[in-house]
Amino acid sequence: MDKKKAPGQTVASSNWLQLQSTLSTITKEKDVSNSKAHNSRSSQSPSSSLRSSSRIQRKSKHSQGVGQYMGRVEVASTAKTTVSQLRKGKVISNEPCILLEAFSDSPLLHELRHMVLGNHLLSESQKEPGQYLAIDCEMVGVGPNGMENTLARVSIVNYHGAVILDTFVQPREPVTDYRTWISGVKQSDLLGAPQFDEVNKQVANLLHDKILIGHAIDNDLKVLMLTHPGPLTRDTQKYKPLQEIAKNKRPGLKKLSELLLGVQIQTGAHSSVVDARVAMALYRLHKKEWERSVWRQTEAYRSISSVNKPEHVLGKRGHDEKEAEDGEETAGESKRKNRKKSGNGGGRQQFPGGGRKGISSGLDVIVRRNGQRVDENGRGDGTSRRKAGRGEISTFTGGESWWEQPAA
């Protein structure tokens, strides 16, 4: 006889009972796998556990990005680059960038990759400003919603990547957006930083008459409130061969660094030191062709600007960057050498009075009367002088001079 269910009692359906049994089986299997995993982790050696903890620490430190670098002593107006020996294999860098596989075994590429990381040894002479400087700035937001840019940090490196200037700048307006996630600048970094006018003057003095390299350099000059002569500016974003490689009319610095240097940058907050070094590295890779394409404009500008320079400044080209090591002699330098050789070895002998031997430096004045040439005595067309030279007539005939005669 069928059992009748009591009033108010609910009986589970067959489908629900089957689902419950399946769920209980899955739960038991998970418990068994979790217990096995726990036992395997507990059986690991202390050294492996230490390695895993160190990996976690490194990951957390790396995630802080440029903040680690920004808090160091090097970030100041008297900053010095960190130098170390070139190493093989994995490179440990204090900057937020990653060394990828090299595309070639070129010594120049090898040097430039380590220059970007600051992992290279420099001599004292290579730490001087020199004739080539690369610049990059970090900006924070001011105004409503932080939409306007203002200078917060400026970094300048030389031809070899040595830091010439790296300093925070105290904004002249209240900051409404520090953009720390991309600029790496925190509010505490700007406390006690140099005033804008002081940094502006310092940068202007450094950049005077230098070849200036940068990426989208107009943005940096704008926040610095400076200008730089076009013939002395090298913008890696506007250089056509780099645009063609990146297949973009406005290539990003990060993409160019990966394509040409094999260095991944801007993995977190940006570092203006790293970005300036990358711009310099890209310029040095193409320096020979780049300078050949603009040497006429550069030399024309220098020749014009040299007119207003004091005599003791003329011909001063700054510290030797040792471009010969890279085979980077420019077309302008080659032309100057050829002109110098032809000037010294052309067989022309110079004299104190100017001009060349056997050639008069004055002008002959020819006087004519009624369309006829007149000799030194004011007579005729000069035939009497020629005849006198042959002994045919006397050189002085006397009589009235032509200017004393009445007009016809």
From Swiss-Prot:
Q: Which InterPro entries match?
A: Exonuclease_RNaseT/DNA_pol3 (IPR013520), REX4_DEDDh_dom (IPR037431), REXO1/3/4-like (IPR047021), RNaseH-like_sf (IPR012337), RNaseH_sf (IPR036397)
Query: What is this enzyme's EC?
Result: 3.1.-.-
What SMART domains does the annotation carry? EXOIII (SM00479)
Q: Which GO terms describe its molecular function?
A: 3'-5' exonuclease activity; exonuclease activity; nucleic acid binding
- Does Protease show up as a keyword for this record? no
Gene3D superfamilies, A to Z:
Ribonuclease H-like superfamily/Ribonuclease H
Q: Which UniProt keywords apply?
A: Exonuclease, Hydrolase, Nuclease, Nucleus, rRNA processing
List the Pfam families hit by this protein, alphabetically. Answer: RNase_T (PF00929)
Which cellular components does GO assign to this protein? nucleus
Give a short account of what the protein does: Exoribonuclease involved in ribosome biosynthesis. Involved in the processing of ITS1, the internal transcribed spacer localized between the 18S and 5.8S rRNAs.
Membership in a protein family: Belongs to the REXO4 family.
Protein name, as recorded: RNA exonuclease 4
The organism named in the record is Cryptococcus neoformans var. neoformans serotype D (strain JEC21 / ATCC MYA-565) (Filobasidiella neoformans)
